Amino acid sequence: ALALKDADLGIAMGNGTQATKAVAQIVLVDSKFSVLPGVLSEGRRIIANMERVSSLFLAKTTYAAVLVIVTALVGWRYPFLPRQFSYIDSLTIGIPAFFLALWPNPRRYVPGFLKRTLSLAMPTGVILAAAALTAFGIVDGPPQSRESTAAILSLMLGAIWLLVITSRPLSTWKWVLLASVISATVGGVLIAPVRHFFSMVAPTGHEWFVIACVGACAALLVEVAQRIFYARKFKRSLEG
């Protein structure tokens, strides 16, 4: 029991003494060590996938905060309605995060979870907020929903690229997930009932060009941020 107390991870057999099981972190109910690889895989999946999903949520928190601050300072109206935020969140965070969190991930635990997550999420959030504000400023109404639509789609293009980054390495099912997100994003604008529900309008040719340019720049900058900040932090964590 004393040895288990001092161990990094105490493992006790189910048929062991009560004192041993009381101090152990893991108790093998059937007293078989053969179940440990499965326990290890489950732990790795939870920790590694938490890092993936956290980047998506923290990036959203960052760009929402930046948008509030900037629009308040410059006197612009906020680019999005609450229902439009639901549209963005569902397609770039909620639905993809559900599948990413459940998928197996064999990557071993690497210290520095919070620093790595913030090193990707915070720069990305600033980039996505800048993309939304740029498109919002370039595209003119009326109606006002025209500006919001451009801001939504520009931000979502960058957010989808963040989803690509957090999904790496890409497998068949992840390509299917990404294709579904992109199809739903475009479909939400093209399908009239959905478009009207989220108070969006069909972009003109010029507006599609603006959206594509701003969104592509946002995606490129997100990739650069990942390589400069996150990849370096991850390498240092491995070396440390």
Please tell me what each predicted stretch does:
Residues 1-7:
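Acidic, divalent-metal-coordinating active-site segment for phosphoryl/phosphodiester hydrolysis
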Residues 135-240:
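C-terminal transmembrane module of polytopic membrane proteins
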Residues 15-173, 186-191:
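Membrane-embedded transport module
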